Amino acid sequence: MAQSQNIRIRLKAFDYRVLDTSTQEIVNTAKRTGASVRGPIPLPNKIEKFTVLRGPHVDKKSRDQFEIRTHKRLLDIVDPTPQTVDALMKLDLAAGVDVEIKLQS
């Protein structure tokens, strides 16, 4: 029995709206070229919190808190055609979206 190939795409962004539009572009491109898509699967958000002193001196109890949320999505493209790979290579995604692509057998 022949092994099927999968393309696993992992997307990260600080803004979930930009991430969702980029994910939708990838899904539409893959479906248009004849590949089946599993996902998008939302992965857990990473929340980094930073606490800093508000003033330069004296008030230790006066502090500000900041956080950075990193949103993640996972896509699996099952049995991609050569047209799918070409279309994904030419796809221009929004700035601020980090893309990791792995080819699995």
UniProtKB/Swiss-Prot annotation:
A single GO CC term for this protein reads:
ribonucleoprotein complex
Example GO molecular function: tRNA binding
The alphabetized UniProt keywords are: Ribonucleoprotein, Ribosomal protein
Q: Supply the SUPFAM superfamilies for this chain.
A: Ribosomal protein S10 (SSF54999)
NCBIfam families in UniProt: PRK00596.1 (NF001861), rpsJ_bact (TIGR01049)
Quaternary arrangement and interactors, per the entry? Part of the 30S ribosomal subunit.
Q: What is this protein called?
A: Small ribosomal subunit protein uS10
Q: Which organism is it from?
A: Roseobacter denitrificans (strain ATCC 33942 / OCh 114)
* Gene this protein is translated from: rpsJ
